[in-house]
A protein has these predicted regions:
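Short, well-formed alpha-helical segments that are part of the catalytic scaffolds
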Residues: 17-38, 53, 286-302
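Active-site-proximal specificity loops/subdomain of glycosyltransferases
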Residues: 62-114, 313-349
Length: 349
């Protein structure tokens, strides 16, 4: 087992057994049991949790390859907590503060690490729900990570968004990148060389602060997706299947088939804030033509109708018999009508 690579995890009882069906899971019967699968992996392990979790840990592990850091749930009520609570719509009251703090926990592990690790990777405590721990105990994937990864790694799956990316509004998420976000960085396993973690953590902190202040929130995976596009010099990713199951990455890694990529830096492109875009249409005596234009938008590129903050019809018509039809169409397509008589195309601009 590679002693230069340490896994980092944490486990807290956030009372998911009290949530509605579909979200409820027993802490003891599900999370603790799956956590024990991870505890049986004989690698160096840094664990965050409340005091009572230590008994579970050291029934299985020794102090030699384990560092337990007591971290109570009050720690998650940090400077972002109230902002998260004001934005969230779900009743999963501690879920978002916890998952969005994984990066901070990984960085804390870097600071307190007693093993002097060269690589650190966050791993969800219950990842064995979908990923066999045999990849770590038998298939030497930690050795392969150490050999192949020289940037901060995210495992990503392709995602064609319509309205959101894990709760983060789309296309508004593109405000923070110079490209269209079409992949999601998984939160179950991420990390890399120790000397990359502090930088990525700082970028993540700034991004969380900015997006929350702008009124946007998804999960940690939404922010991971943005980081890939913003900082390709610091990050890399390996692509898995659309179902998002992380085992695919470890299977490829085991067989020396995993590929690692970085996003292409787009240069100093101006970032377009879609919330500040307006659409202007100039028309003259032809409401049917205006209607046809809007129908073509609806069929071929609905973003023209959905994204602009304002849609304005500059009506240059002199034929007053068209007024009622224009009024009807503006209500239909959500346009604000401005009448200036016939001021021409240049005057309209």
């Amino acid at each position: 087992m590679n002693k230069k690579v340490t896994l980092v995890t944490g486990l807290w009882d956030i009372k998911r057994d009290t949530l509605e069906p579909g979200w409820n899971r027993s802490f003891k019967d599900h999370y603790v049991e799956k956590f024990k699968d991870l505890l049986n992996v004989p690698c160096n392990l840094i664990i965050f949790g409340e005091e009572e979790l230590k008994e579970v840990v050291f029934e299985i592990r020794s102090e030699e390859n384990t560092q337990f850091i007591v971290r109570n749930q009050d720690w998650f009520k940090n400077e972002f907590y109230e902002k998260i609570q004001s934005i969230r719509t779900s009743e999963q009251w501690m879920y978002n503060p916890l998952v969005m703090s994984k990066m901070f926990l990984l960085n804390d592990a870097r600071i307190f690490d007693k093993f002097q690790s060269e690589h650190l990777y966050w791993i969800d405590a219950a990842l064995s729900t979908t990923v066999s721990m045999g990849y770590f105990t038998s298939d030497n994937v930690l050795d392969k990570l150490y050999e192949k990864v020289n940037k901060f790694l995210f495992i990503c799956f392709p995602y064609e968004a319509n309205t959101e990316i894990h709760g983060f509004a789309y296309p508004e998420i593109n405000i923070y990148t110079t490209d269209n976000v079409n992949k999601v960085g998984r939160g179950g396993f991420f990390g890399g060389p120790v000397d990359t973690i502090g930088d990525v953590n700082a970028k993540y902190y700034d991004l969380m602060s900015t997006t929350l202040n702008d009124g946007f929130m998804g999960t940690e995976e939404s922010l991971f997706s943005i980081l890939l596009y913003q900082f390709p010099d610091l990050t890399c990713y390996s692509l898995i299947e659309e179902n998002g199951l992380i085992y695919y990455f470890f299977e490829k890694l085991k067989n020396n088939e995993a590929l690692f990529h970085s996003e292409v830096k787009r240069g100093n492109l101006e970032i377009i804030d879609y919330r500040k875009v307006a659409l202007y249409v100039i028309t003259y005596n032809s409401p049917d033509q205006f209607d046809t234009l809007c129908k073509s938008f609806e069929i071929y590129d609905k973003d023209y109708l959905d994204l602009p903050k304002r849609k304005i019809l500059l009506n240059n018509s002199m034929d007053r018999s068209t007024d009622d039809k224009y009024k009807e169409l503006c209500e239909k397509w959500g346009f604000e009508e401005i009448k200036k008589d016939n001021i021409g195309i240049c005057g309209g601009r």
